[in-house]
Structure formats: C-alpha cells, structure tokens
A protein has these predicted regions:
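Long, charged, low-complexity intrinsically disordered regions
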Residues: 1-88
Length: 88
C-alpha cells in the first residue's frame, strides 16, 4: 500500500467519504487550515446523511477550533457548512 501523502484540491467543499473514519479529523483539520489560509470564508464538509456519527464527530472537532466562527447543518446535502474567520 502506498502511504505517500495525497494532495487534495482546495475548493469550497471537501467530501469526506473517501477517507477512513480514523483519518477524517486530521484530513478535515488540514483542509480547514489551508482553506482559511487561501481566503475561503465559507466551506462545506460533506459527511453524508446516514446515522449521523460522522456528522457528530466533525461537529465536535469544529467546536474546538478557534478559527471556526460558526457552523450549521445542510441536511439536504449531508454536509456541515462552516464559517471561517479571516486570516490573522
């Protein structure tokens, strides 16, 4: 198995489906950090609808980040919309 880093294009949305559950926190944190550095103020983390475990884990992480101003569900897309503060 190739453990080389995978570069993820930075757009206004990140689909978390391709990642293993144990990778999601690190991947989402890296994505949010880079998105903020590149000037994004609002992004979507797509975690799916399912039973809500991935959503709960993502939102728990978002509560711990000081550069996240707010977030809310977009249930129709199975996503959480995240409002980021501007760069320092």
């Amino acid at each position: 198995m190739d453990d080389a880093p995978v570069e993820i294009p930075i757009t206004d949305a990140l689909d978390l489906h391709p990642f293993r559950a144990e990778e999601v926190r690190d991947v989402a944190l890296e994505y949010l950090t880079v998105a903020r550095e590149r000037g994004f103020r609002q992004v979507r983390l797509i975690h799916g609808r399912g039973i809500g475990m991935q959503r709960a884990n993502v939102q728990a992480m978002l509560r711990s980040l000081d550069f996240v101003q707010n977030f809310w569900d977009d249930a129709s897309l199975g996503a959480t919309v995240v409002l980021l503060s501007g760069k320092d």
